């Protein structure tokens, strides 16, 4: 576990089915069967559950020729139905992204804006608590460790509900191109983009108090290289701020928008 004093062991099986409805709509539904054990020298927590899950995506971008303009909306749910207890949990995630080309030349300048929201329903145990920090939430902040978690002054970084607002500027430096390698005639991509980002996030254990605390903010820059199958790889350097305090963090790059 990233910050609790447990070693995690997972046994899992997963089935998902999905399809496109036209060019812009995609739906997926499925479930996981999982057994997770969190253990240390003094205690063992065991969870045995089935996890129904699904998502719906609406995407107006031309992701193959021009993904720099359009709208991307993602709705998703993930739940736990435990076999050994009456506990049932549900997480509902929402993401709304907007893209616009400010400069439409070959080396484009694109603005992107995203609003994300996650909320949980049910009796959520501490091993499932969410956090802010890292490339998937608020960049410029590290993923919390046990030292951060046990310090009561850092309680603002953990919760069951969060909202994140992100803005990015993306400048194409080397336009993406495709070439064929000599080995098995595989096709590869190359290109390079630079980004600047600002993230602002709120998190709380109570939904009604979500926006009652000072937000966590991150600002920084990074680089992106296209990679087949996984989209892009990159590197970010960001500064995290809350109130008047701030510190720099270097991390693997991943766009939130």
Regions found by a protein language model. Give the residues of each.
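Gram-negative/organellar outer-membrane beta-barrel architecture
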Residues: 1-65, 71-73, 136-151, 155-158, ...
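Transmembrane beta-barrel strands of outer-membrane/channel proteins
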Residues: 1, 29-35, 71-79, 94, ...
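Outer-membrane beta-barrel transmembrane domain signature
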Residues: 106, 168-176, 193-219
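Transmembrane beta-barrel architecture of outer-membrane proteins
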Residues: 9-13, 33-37, 50, 79, ...
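Short, solvent-exposed loop/turn segments at secondary-structure boundaries
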Residues: 40-43, 86-88, 208-211
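C-terminal outer-membrane beta-barrel translocator/porin domains of Gram-negative envelope proteins
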Residues: 52-191, 248-252, 257
């Amino acid at each position: 576990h990233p910050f609790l004093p447990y070693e995690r062991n997972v046994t899992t099986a997963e089935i998902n089915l999905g399809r496109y409805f036209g060019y812009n709509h995609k739906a997926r539904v499925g479930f996981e069967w999982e057994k997770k054990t969190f253990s240390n020298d003094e205690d063992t927590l065991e969870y045995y559950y089935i996890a129904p899950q699904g998502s719906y995506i609406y995407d107006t971008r031309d992701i193959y020729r021009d993904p720099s303009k359009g709208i991307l909306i993602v709705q998703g749910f993930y739940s736990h139905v435990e076999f050994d207890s009456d506990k049932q949990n549900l997480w509902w995630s929402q993401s709304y992204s907007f893209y616009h080309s400010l400069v439409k030349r070959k080396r484009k300048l694109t603005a992107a804006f995203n609003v994300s929201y996650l909320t949980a329903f049910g009796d959520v145990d501490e091993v499932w608590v969410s956090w802010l920090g890292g490339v998937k939430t608020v960049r410029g902040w590290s993923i919390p460790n046990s030292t951060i978690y046990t310090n009561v002054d850092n309680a603002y970084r953990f919760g069951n509900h969060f909202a994140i607002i992100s803005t990015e500027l993306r400048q194409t430096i080397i336009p993406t191109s495709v070439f064929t390698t000599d080995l098995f005639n595989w096709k590869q991509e190359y290109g390079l983009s630079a980004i600047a980002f600002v993230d602002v996030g709120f998190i709380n254990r109570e939904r009604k108090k979500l926006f009652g605390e000072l937000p966590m903010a991150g600002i920084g820059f990074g680089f992106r290289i296209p990679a087949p199958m996984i989209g892009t790889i990159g590197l970010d350097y960001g500064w995290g701020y809350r109130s008047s305090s701030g510190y720099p963090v270097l991390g693997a790059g991943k766009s939130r928008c």
